[in-house]
């Protein structure tokens, strides 16, 4: 988050100040990439397309930092849904994925994760074990920091559905993490024995 | 609900990783982003002004629709009074435009009639035969594809259209109010916005009184007045005095 400076930075960026824009970009792009990584691939491309759209609309944007984040992530989601459609079209399965869902879940893998020093990419991969909506809502709520109503609008669900998805998602993640922790400490113990 | 799961200590390492500061790799795209930012600066003013003008267009359309609806209310009464007061033979002009589209029922048809007749009735009659009925859709479609409306408004065909609408700036609203026979109306300005609003108040007024006139009666009265309603005004052709402002 940029915080107090945000209004000033945004207005400077709006008038063409590249340094100000770079600050906005640096602040948000990592989170944006992590969010877009829920699709599993092409996060960089989709992020670049997102910024392309954002810079074109920047002069007309009005709002505070939360509104800014909501706007950027709404744009990102549209691009991600488009990219998802292209993928399914390329896979010659146009009838699938009509929901507009673009998140691809993953099965648990057996990679050894050192839980205390997870990379953000590994963390996103763990989140992707959740059902798509839960994964997306958890990231938007907990990592991007959007409100329930903003997330609801963004994903096209009711606030109630978003609350439930966030709650269950976090519960599921806690379970995954504690199981992972057990597995890891077990294997660590085994290694010490042998 | 149980305690907020976000407080579960098992989640802490995961959340920490998800919220971790940017990795080097995640900042790689900055150059490309700044380039597109720079490119957008060059083209930025036009988009924003276009957006502004679109807002005005929409506002204008809304306003036009409102005026049309008002005109229907007042004009409907006026027309009824007019009809009952005068001999049908002597005043075919009032109905001409209305009868041109008796098949296309509905509120917007009534609204369209009113926008033209609600104004100085003489001027409006001049337009009736051309810009109402089936021709209107074609004209509106053509209009929606014209880039320079200022110039286009002076073309003979569009002159009738703008006259019917009450000005080139009102054509979009007028076209939007057309019944969607060929679906052409939606091709104009803000598709979603227009059709929703006004028509509900409209239908009360007219339909019963409309069919009296025969379109065939119209032409004789027509040529006396010029349909030029373009705001820019062609002084050479016609003084813009007959401008139907939509005030009944």
Predicted regions and their residues:
Chain A
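Internal acidic/polar
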Residues: 2-6, 90-120, 147, 190
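Short, small-hydrophobic-rich alpha-helical interface motif
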Residues: 13, 32, 36, 43-54, ...
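Short helix-capping/turn signature of helix-turn-helix
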Residues: 27-30, 38-39, 139-147
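DNA-recognition helix of helix-turn-helix
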Residues: 77, 81, 134, 143, ...
């Amino acid at each position: 988050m940029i915080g107090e400076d945000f209004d000033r930075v945004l207005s400077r960026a709006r008038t063409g100040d590249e340094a100000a824009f770079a600050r906005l970009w640096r602040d948000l792009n990592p989170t944006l990439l992590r969010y877009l990584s829920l699709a599993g691939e092409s996060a960089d491309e989709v992020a670049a397309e997102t910024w392309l759209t954002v810079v074109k609309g920047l002069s007309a944007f009005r709002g505070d930092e939360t509104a800014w984040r909501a706007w950027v992530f709404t744009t990102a989601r549209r691009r991600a849904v488009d990219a998802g459609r292209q993928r399914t079209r390329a896979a010659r399965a146009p009838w699938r994925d009509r929901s507009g869902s673009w998140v691809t879940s993953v099965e648990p893998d057996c990679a050894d994760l050192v839980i205390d020093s997870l990379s953000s990419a590994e963390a996103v991969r763990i989140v992707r074990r959740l059902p798509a909506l839960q994964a997306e809502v958890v990231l938007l709520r907990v990592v991007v920091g959007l409100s329930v109503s903003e997330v609801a609008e963004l994903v096209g669900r009711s606030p109630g559905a978003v609350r439930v998805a966030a709650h269950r998602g976090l519960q599921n993640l806690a379970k995954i993490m504690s199981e992972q922790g057990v597995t890891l400490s077990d294997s660590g113990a085994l290694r010490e024995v042998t | 609900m149980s305690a907020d799961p976000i407080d579960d200590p098992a989640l802490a390492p995961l959340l920490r990783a998800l919220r971790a500061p940017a990795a080097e790799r995640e900042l790689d795209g900055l150059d490309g982003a700044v380039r597109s930012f720079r490119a957008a600066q060059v083209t930025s003013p036009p988009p924003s002004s276009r957006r502004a003008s679109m807002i005005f267009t929409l506002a204008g359309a809304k306003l036009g629709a409102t005026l049309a609806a008002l005109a229907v209310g007042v004009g409907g009464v006026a027309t009824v009074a007019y009809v009952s007061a005068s001999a049908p033979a002597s005043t075919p002009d009032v109905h001409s435009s209305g009868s041109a589209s008796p098949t296309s029922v509905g509120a917007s048809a009534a609204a369209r009639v009113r926008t033209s007749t609600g104004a100085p009735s003489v001027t409006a009659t001049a337009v009736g035969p051309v810009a109402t009925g089936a021709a209107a859709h074609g004209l509106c479609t053509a209009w929606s594809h014209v880039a320079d409306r200022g110039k286009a408004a002076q073309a003979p065909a569009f002159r009738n259209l703008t006259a019917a609408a009450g000005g080139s700036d009102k054509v979009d609203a007028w076209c939007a109010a057309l019944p969607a026979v060929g679906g052409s109306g939606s091709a104009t300005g803000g598709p979603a916005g227009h059709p929703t609003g006004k028509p509900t108040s409209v239908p009360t007024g007219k339909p019963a009184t409309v069919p009296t006139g025969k379109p065939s009666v119209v032409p004789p009265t027509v040529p006396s007045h010029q349909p030029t309603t373009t705001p820019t005004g062609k002084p050479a052709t016609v003084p813009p005095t007959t401008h139907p402002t939509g005030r009944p």
